[in-house]
């Protein structure tokens, strides 16, 4: 049984929603000099030639705003666990250039990795599957549970919001842990022991549909805490009959989910055009409410996403296996749609 943290986490990322009455309390308005530096590096990178896979913090150095980026990165990695940057002129920049700018800035927070079988370093968060549960969540309009992704940090840049709904939600995993430590410490052992995850058709060739290893929800390595919470993939492994849950495991999952949705824990707000949020995915859960989309393709909800790896971050073996060194392996001919093997 892994060692369980039996003292509350007293870290900046152990915040509650009541600490941030509005997103204005943690937003940063970009200045002209920030945009000038970003645009200059986009032009320089395009002139040199190269693709998305060639972008990193050396090919996109952003030297003129390096001190600001270092401060923002510190806030994400070891501070609050998230920052909101405002003022990217998404209507005045081509989508191709916007992707370059986004990857270039994001590479200073971590190494961009693939987000699906398609090998996409920039994920298009668009409504392809409506409310179909067979489609990956980020390509649907259905309400999501608070969860983490398979990366150390994530970023979301809003190009267009939905016509109704689609609020972004966040909750500190450290706060959830602290509350459970106070109220139901007996349940934590199940969360530290972890669960087998369904791979949703994204396992490499020759690998099983469900992870061989238990993936810990909470873990601490060299004093550094991590969370992995994807209830949907745990549920799918159960629904297809690959694993069963004990009464204690089910209670622990339900209690964690209930705590995460408390009003004084969960923070919800609307992402508006030109707003970019960086989130420490090792410490912060995120979600999105159900939304209604426009019938006009050019007016539909559109965000773009990054998955970023922080290679130096200590993590348990199960965490490293879950995330992979390069994200989700690209597999030609495969997309983001999965048909469950659950019996009819």
Model-predicted segments: where are they?
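Active-site environment of non-heme Fe oxygenases that use a 2-His-1-carboxylate facial triad
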Residues: 1-66, 70-72, 78, 83, ...
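"Short basic amphipathic alpha-helical interaction patches in structured regions
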Residues: 96-103, 170-172
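A short alpha->loop->secondary-structure connector
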Residues: 102-113
């Amino acid at each position: 049984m892994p060692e369980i943290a039996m003292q509350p986490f007293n870290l900046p990322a152990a915040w509650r929603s009541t600490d941030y009455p509005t997103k204005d309390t943690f937003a940063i308005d970009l200045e002209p000099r920030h945009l000038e530096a970003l645009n200059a590096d986009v032009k320089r990178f395009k002139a040199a030639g190269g693709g998305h896979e060639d972008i990193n913090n050396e090919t996109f150095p952003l030297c003129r705003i390096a001190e600001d980026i270092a401060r923002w990165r510190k806030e994400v990695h070891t501070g609050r666990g998230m920052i909101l940057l405002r003022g990217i002129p998404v209507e005045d920049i081509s989508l191709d250039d916007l992707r370059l700018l986004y990857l270039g800035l994001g590479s200073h927070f971590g190494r961009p990795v693939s987000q699906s079988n398609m090998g996409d370093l920039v994920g298009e968060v668009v409504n392809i599957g409506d409310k179909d549960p067979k489609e990956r969540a980020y390509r649907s309009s259905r309400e999501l549970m608070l969860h983490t992704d398979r990366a150390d940090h994530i970023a979301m840049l809003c190009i267009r919001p939905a016509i109704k709904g689609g609020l972004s939600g966040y909750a500190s995993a450290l706060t959830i842990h602290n509350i459970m430590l106070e109220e139901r410490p007996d349940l934590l052992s199940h969360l530290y022991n972890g669960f087998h995850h369904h791979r949703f058709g994204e396992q490499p060739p020759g690998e099983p549909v469900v992870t061989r290893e238990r993936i810990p929800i909470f873990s601490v390595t060299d004093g550094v805490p991590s969370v992995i919470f994807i209830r949907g993939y745990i549920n799918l492994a159960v629904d297809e009959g690959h694993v069963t849950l004990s009464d204690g495991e089910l209670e622990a999952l339900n209690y964690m989910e209930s705590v995460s949705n408390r009003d004084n824990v969960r923070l919800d707000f609307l992402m508006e055009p030109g707003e970019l949020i960086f989130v420490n995915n090792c410490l912060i859960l995120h979600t999105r409410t159900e939304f209604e989309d426009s019938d006009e393709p050019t007016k539909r909800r559109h965000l773009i996403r990054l998955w970023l790896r922080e290679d130096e971050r200590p993590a348990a073996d199960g965490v490293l296996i879950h995330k992979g060194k390069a994200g989700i392996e690209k597999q030609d001919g495969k997309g983001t749609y999965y048909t469950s093997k659950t019996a009819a």
